[in-house]
Every structure is written in C-alpha cells, then in structure tokens.
C-alpha cells in the first residue's frame, strides 16, 4: 500500500469540526423579500418603523470619516453613555456586536462539555445555538398553555450540571413576560453557581407595573447578568450593538474571551448618541402603544387568536383548517408584499409573528388577513 493511501486511512479526507457542531441548526432570520412585488413591508424582524434617532445617524456619519483607525477596544464612550442613561458604573458594562455576541460569550465562558443550560421551549433560538456551540447540553423547559414561562418548571429542571439559565423577559416570539416577583422567586431558588441570564431586548416597550428589566438584580447579585440591545427601540439593528451589566467577576470573565476590537467605531458613536436621545425613544414607545393595541383588537375581531403582547410584535394564531392555516396565510400575505415571520422553528407551526409597523403596513395586514379569511385568491 502506498504512503498516501495509508495516510488517507489514518486521517479524514478533510478538516472536520468537533463532534456536535454539524448537528447545530443554523439561525435563519426573517424573510425580507417577496418575489415580483414592487412595494414590500418587512414585518418579520421586529425592527422599529420609526428608524434610528437623527442624532445617532449624525454620530455614525461623523465617525465614518476616520475608518483607517482602530476603534476603542473597550467601547468606553458607549459604556459611559449607557452608564449615564441608566445610572450605573460603566465598569459593570460590557458591549458586544449585538446581544447575540454577548449570549455566545456567556455560553463559552460558563458552559463546558456536558454542562447544562436551560431555556424555555419558545425562547430565542440563539440560546440553543450558543449552548451547543460551547459543547453544552440544552435543556428545554415547556411553557404553560397560555405561552407564559413556567418558573416552577424551570426550577424543577435545575440539576447539578446546570450552569446557565437563559430567560427572555419579555419573550420573543410570544410577547409574554414574567412579573418581576416571579423572576426574583426563580433567582432565590437557584444555586449560587448557576448564572441567570435576563435577556431584556424588548424591555423598553413594556407598560406593566409588575415588570422590571433585571438591572437592579444584576447589580446586586453575583450570578445574574442582564442583556440589552440597540436593535429594537433604538433602530440600530444594522450596526449590531448589544450590552450587558453584571457583577465585576462576570464582566471580567467575558472581557477575557471577547475579541479585542469587537465593536466598530461608527457603532460605538451611534449607540452613545441613541441611548441619550430620550425623546426619540418616547416617540417610538408612543407609536408602539397605539398600534399594538389597535392590531390586537382588529386581528381578534377577524376571529384570530392573538397572544397578549408587551413587545413590539404580536403572535397571531391560525386554525388548522385547510385554506386558513398559518402557512397559507404567510404565502397570501407575501404575495401582497407583507412579510411576517413564520415561527415553526420556535415550536409554533400554526402561528405567525408580526412586527408593529407603520400605520400603512398595519392597516394593509389587517385588510389582507380579512381578505384571506374570506377566501380571496390574492
């Protein structure tokens, strides 16, 4: 046998990723195009219809004149702006290229082979991806029938191997939330070595007296981290800006494994301007308050079930009856240039998630669904 033949037998024919990597289902974002449609309304990714703050745009453009320079590796200006807006020490803050990066950093810092990370059945898909990417074992906890997260079930799923609990509050794609006394009850039941991750990406939209973001808990507890994003209410999804606050020990661990220049300079500048523009945020909240209520009422009047939402989206449930299913509604809406998010990958095959859009988009969706349910061909 030739030497090359022996080598082929001894080694794989190509580099192979470590076990488990190819078993990960890659994240698939919401659709953004509709073939053959002149005007498209993208309501699939929970982007704000009002766009970013004009001050953020100006800061982004100004920072773009120095693209030859490396950014500040510590994102100092952004952390200081967040600290000023939130009243917290910038040293307790870490910034990332979207909260996705921070979620992955958490998994890689605290979850190893054989370790368990808990997430809810209808939670953000990145939790499972991050856990598997770190070599860990995702533990999926079922939600209640009303799609509310089940604190008792989460507590019951904790074992000696549990290292992290990912909890989106509010949750995407359901729009449900946990009152903060329930979050505190969950935290009180955890061993001190289990890190509770509070993903508050949609927190700015919540208008409930019993809701809290988790900021105070993250500042006072050693095993809590609260994550936030600039992609939603701040309208900076294209720039990928996320941040988190936690104990000094947790922030130190994450900083040790993040990239040395993980935030680009225009993003740092735009984010710093955006978070200090409270008036723009209030306009976005007011728009969402108006149209979230209107859409929920109008869609319910069509005979559809809508899960009560505190976010900038609604989860619409369709019957299994042929001609009236979620998949058929999705195709019908797409033909009209109205792109919603199919959420079968979240375990909700009979539902569509709709972002609160402009007045025009919102009214068009309601009319289109009325036509669909009445049997119109297009």
From Swiss-Prot:
Has the keyword DNA repair been applied to this entry? no
Q: Which EC number(s) are documented for this chain?
A: 2.6.1.9
Q: Which NCBIfam families match?
A: hisC
Give the N6-(pyridoxal phosphate)lysine positions (modified residues): 232
Question: Which organism is this protein's natural source?
Answer: Azorhizobium caulinodans (strain ATCC 43989 / DSM 5975 / JCM 20966 / LMG 6465 / NBRC 14845 / NCIMB 13405 / ORS 571)
Basic and acidic residues bias (residue ranges) = 7-17
**Top EC category:** transferase
Enzymatic reactions: L-histidinol phosphate + 2-oxoglutarate = 3-(imidazol-4-yl)-2-oxopropyl phosphate + L-glutamate
Q: One MF term from GO for this chain?
A: pyridoxal phosphate binding
What CDD domains does this protein's entry cite?
AAT_like
According to its UniProt record, which protein family does this protein belong to?
Answer: Belongs to the class-II pyridoxal-phosphate-dependent aminotransferase family. Histidinol-phosphate aminotransferase subfamily.
Task: Answer whether the UniProt record assigns the keyword Amino-acid biosynthesis to this protein.
Answer: yes
The UniProt entry, under Pfam families, shows: Aminotran_1_2
Name of this protein: Histidinol-phosphate aminotransferase
Q: Where is this region: Disordered?
A: 1-20
Q: List keywords of the entry alphabetically.
A: Amino-acid biosynthesis, Aminotransferase, Histidine biosynthesis, Pyridoxal phosphate, Transferase
Q: In which pathway does it act?
A: Amino-acid biosynthesis; L-histidine biosynthesis; L-histidine from 5-phospho-alpha-D-ribose 1-diphosphate: step 7/9
Q: Which GO terms describe its biological process?
A: L-histidine biosynthetic process
> Which InterPro entries would you find in this protein's record?
Aminotransferase_I/II_large, HisP_aminotrans, HistidinolP_aminotransfase, PyrdxlP-dep_Trfase, PyrdxlP-dep_Trfase_major, PyrdxlP-dep_Trfase_small
Q: Which cofactor does it need?
A: pyridoxal 5'-phosphate
Query: SUPFAM superfamilies per the record?
Result: PLP-dependent transferases (SSF53383)
Q: How does it assemble?
A: Homodimer.
